[in-house]
UniProtKB/Swiss-Prot annotation:
Keyword flag RNA-binding: yes
Native source species: Xanthobacter autotrophicus (strain ATCC BAA-1158 / Py2)
Protein name, UniProt field: Large ribosomal subunit protein uL5
Gene name for this UniProt entry: rplE
InterPro entries in UniProt: Ribosomal_uL5, Ribosomal_uL5_bac-type, Ribosomal_uL5_C, Ribosomal_uL5_CS, Ribosomal_uL5_dom_sf, Ribosomal_uL5_N
Pfam family, one: Ribosomal_L5
Residue pairs linked by disulfide bridges in the UniProt entry: none
Amino acid sequence: MAEATYTPKLRTFYDEVVRPKMIEQFGYKNPMEVPTIDKIVINMGVGEATADTKKVTTAAADLAQIAGQKPVITRARKAISNFKLRENQPVGAKVTLRKARMYEFMDRLVSIALPRVRDFRGLNPKSFDGRGNYAMGVKEHIVFPEINYDRVEQIWGMDIIVCTTAKTDEEARALLKAFNFPFRQ
């Protein structure tokens, strides 16, 4: 007897709605040519880590709750005396999400977290890098539903990078719009 495998809601949405729409819009000959979302990288830089390294551990724990997987502690590559930073000192945490976790995170980001951001007027449509990847910043990590607001010691910001297989920014923008990313007009 074969076990039933779990498929995220956005993955089936991509297969049934987004892919045919993209083929129609851009005239792809091969369905494998249609851009997909490759990975999502979430990075938390902790500036106060130079004074107290416990803050990196706290930020990493919050990031693990948000992403659903254990983050990697990022370390300083070289010493910078003006920032009181030594080489190999912990300065933040990052997580790379792929496959099911990526789609689940993207669903929570678009439907729950972004609407909870204060004074949110839409994502900047100019934040593409020229190669089909999109980067955005979130000033407060408490917009995610996994974070218990009462237990938060400090509010951290984070960078979220959505890497796609799109060749151009126009294709990537159409892909993310199809996934209901709220871009500014």
